[in-house]
Curated annotation (Swiss-Prot):
This is Css54. It is found in: Secreted; Target cell membrane. Keywords: Antibiotic, Antimicrobial, Cytolysis, Hemolysis, Membrane, Secreted, Target cell membrane, Target membrane. Expressed by the venom gland. Belongs to the non-disulfide-bridged peptide (NDBP) superfamily. Medium-length antimicrobial peptide (group 3) family. It comes from Centruroides suffusus (Durango bark scorpion). Amphipathic peptide that shows antibacterial activity against E.coli (MIC=12.5 ug/ml) and S.aureus (MIC=12.5 ug/ml). Has hemolytic activity against human erythrocytes (25 uM provokes 83% of hemolysis). May act by disrupting the integrity of the bacterial cell membrane. Increases efficacy of antibiotics (ethambutol, pyrazinamide, isoniazid, rifampicin) when tested against S.aureus, probably by facilitating their incorporation into the bacteria. Coiled coil: none annotated.
Length: 25
């Protein structure tokens, strides 16, 4: 369970990071 959650998080993190960078600009 935790393994799939970790892989899902690693996939979502980059997109969330990009969204945060866009809001900063």
């Amino acid at each position: 369970f935790f393994g799939s959650l970790l892989s899902l998080g690693s996939k979502l993190l980059p997109s969330v990071f990009k969204l945060f960078q866009r809001k900063k600009e």
